[in-house]
């Protein structure tokens, strides 16, 4: 009986914790991040689209991230950014793929640095910094295409829709 009561209480606490994490009144810092890879992303030497690896780095400050080179950020960001690095995550997108992520950001993180491992680094925008609002939900949509990674805004979408119809 005691064991059943403890398990019931743990279950209820789990439900309450889950509700707090999705509540609009939550004090967590959250990031809803949508990533879309174009059909022609990250072409190889033969012009074939290829998967692209994306690293998300939670940062206290973006300055050192913005000044570091790709290989440092990609292979040893934690060591290269000791005062700014908080956490990181890696994912891979295939050409034409879309991912929607719901992330809880660490309380000390103020920015998320995006590093996209393009094959042709000198000719693309491979780095991006996203500010995150403390104890709020930040929503961002990113597009990874032939020119690099960029924030995909509703205005850009309407403009692209208009041009597609002409």
Q: What spans do the regions from the language model cover?
A:
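Extracellular beta-sheet/turn segments enriched in Thr/Pro/Gly and aliphatic residues
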Residues: 38-40, 131-166
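A short, solvent-exposed beta-strand micro-motif common in secreted/extracellular proteins
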Residues: 109-119
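C-terminal motif of bacterial Sec signal peptides marking the signal peptidase cleavage site
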Residues: 15-18
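Short coil-to-beta strand junction motifs in C2/discoidin
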Residues: 46-55
């Amino acid at each position: 009986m005691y064991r059943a009561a403890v398990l019931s209480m743990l279950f209820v606490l789990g439900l309450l914790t889950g509700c707090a994490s999705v509540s609009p009144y939550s004090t967590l810092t959250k990031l809803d991040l949508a990533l879309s890879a174009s059909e022609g992303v990250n072409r190889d030497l033969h012009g074939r689209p290829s998967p692209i690896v994306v690293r998300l780095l939670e940062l206290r400050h973006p300055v050192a991230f913005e000044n570091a080179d790709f290989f440092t950020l990609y292979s040893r960001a934690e060591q290269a950014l000791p005062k700014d690095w908080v956490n990181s995550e890696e994912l891979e997108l295939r050409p034409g793929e879309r991912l929607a992520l719901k992330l809880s950001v660490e309380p000390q993180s103020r920015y998320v640095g995006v590093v996209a491992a393009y094959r042709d680094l000198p000719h693309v925008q491979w780095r991006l910094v996203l500010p995150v609002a403390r104890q709020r939900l930040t929503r961002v949509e990113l597009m990874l295409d032939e020119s690099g990674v960029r924030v995909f805004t509703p205005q850009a979408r309407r403009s692209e829709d208009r041009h597609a119809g002409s």
